[in-house]
Amino acid sequence: MGAAAAAGFFFVLLFLSVQGGAVGYTRSDFPRDFVFGAATSAYQYDGAAAEDGRSPTIWDTFAHEGKTKDKGTGDVAADGYHKYKGDVKLMAETGLEAYKFSISWSRLIPNGRGAVNQEGLKYYNNVIDELAKRGIQPHIMLCHLDLPQALEDEYDGWLSPRIVDDFTAYADVCFREFGDRVLHWTTLAEPNIAALGGYDTGVLSPGHCSDPFGLTECTVGNSTVEPYITAHNMILTHAAVVRLYREKYQALQKGIVGINMFSLWSYPLTNSIADLQAAQRYKDFSYGWILHPLVFGDYPQVMKKTIDSRLPSFSQVQTELIKGAIDFIGINHYYSAYVNYRPLVEGVRDYVADRSVSARVYKTDPPTEKYEPTEYPNDPKGLQLALEYLRESYGDFPFYIEENGKGSTNDSLDDPDRVDYIKGYIGGVLDAIRNGVDVRGYFVWSFVDVYELLEGYQSRSGLYRVDFDDGARPRRARRSARWYSDFLKGKKDPVLIAPQ
């Protein structure tokens, strides 16, 4: 998954099973303009890390320093840079209507600013043209956690307000070069998780954390303030890009620009007032952290009160910039959690302590042998509730499910659990639509197996299996690919046939 299993409380969650989601549906039950697709991201899919002018990203550095779980890297990954034509053909054969992928800033503008790499430009033009030839909508993420290392070295990347101008200039290149064929743009992937994992717990690049808050060895960073600084700069960056697009491109190109959020639905562990408040506080610290400023112009009151002077403030000019700077909301949603009250500790706190909740995925902790840390259970109802909550809390925006899928340590082609998962969550989306939520698309994570940011090559999420031991990186369809294809092609009740 993107950064997704990192949600809020990395590696400490257990897993639950809650049923839900419409059953007996077909493709025709969804609105005519609704799109179904699948997703990847640049560092996780492309490979070709040192080819054709690409410069390192913070993920290259993080992985090569051995900080990932399996010590693997995305140097080759699924080798999408060389295999995209075959993959797009496979997408068309599967019946995909859209494909969400990210652009590598370091491949397009290797120094982070300045000269455009013509080989990078050629590659992305080729991908977009290949999709158009096959009748597949491109949905582009401008940055999927892979900041150019050059900017990290120069001014600490997201910790500096200088990132706003550099990112906006990069986005300008993308809109100018690709916007005649791309109508759906997402600025940032999971800023709520990028700030937490990259600058508090340290499990995501660039791996900043400070003791005792990190979940890894902490050598650089300050967990008490850096998550808030980086999220603040991400919000300002997103808003600046939206303003650029609206003023310079939207009237001509007719596209839309949104932001992506990691979504985890929080149930109260009990019906106590304290747990009900904890579940709401979790939502405010997760969804509200990013969306409240972009809709209402400021952070949620509970964050301002709890974090106090450690939370940056917006100037009046910045408030005017950020308020209303969303055309759509993209969410990455994988599972739900039970949340209960945890007293707010005195003294030094990080984001997790500021939130003052405990979270788990089972109401009672199961024996450890009954779950795998790379897997999680099905709760389609949680996705439905999340969508309905976001609509009620932040407005009737269009929504796209930009990632949803099931990772597993099982590398088999026969993956009925993934079929059940995807089928259930698509049903949850349909339930939300029937309840009035303007959901316009659903993307499975991932189209093919990729390098997972938390699990490396230990977890597989692809509809299509990639043999990472074979230099040719061959693809083979899993049962889930066959089910999804049958569904997209209108079969009323796709038969689950094990792949040959």
From Swiss-Prot:
Domain of life: Eukaryota
Enzyme class: hydrolase
Active-site feature positions: E190 (proton donor), E403 (nucleophile)
Amino acids binding a beta-D-glucoside: Q44, H144, Y334, E403, W445
The protein's Enzyme Commission number: 3.2.1.21
SUPFAM superfamilies associated with the record: (Trans)glycosidases
Signal peptide: 1-24
SS bonds (residue pairs): C209-C218
InterPro entries: Glyco_hydro_1, Glycoside_hydrolase_SF
Any Pfam family: Glyco_hydro_1
Reaction(s) catalysed by this chain's protein: Hydrolysis of terminal, non-reducing beta-D-glucosyl residues with release of beta-D-glucose
GO molecular function: beta-D-fucosidase activity; beta-galactosidase activity; beta-glucosidase activity
Entry keywords, A to Z: Disulfide bond, Glycoprotein, Glycosidase, Hydrolase, Signal
Positions of glycan attachment: N222, N410
GO biological process, one term: carbohydrate metabolic process
Family classification: Belongs to the glycosyl hydrolase 1 family.
Record protein name field: Beta-glucosidase 2
Biological source species: Oryza sativa subsp. japonica (Rice)
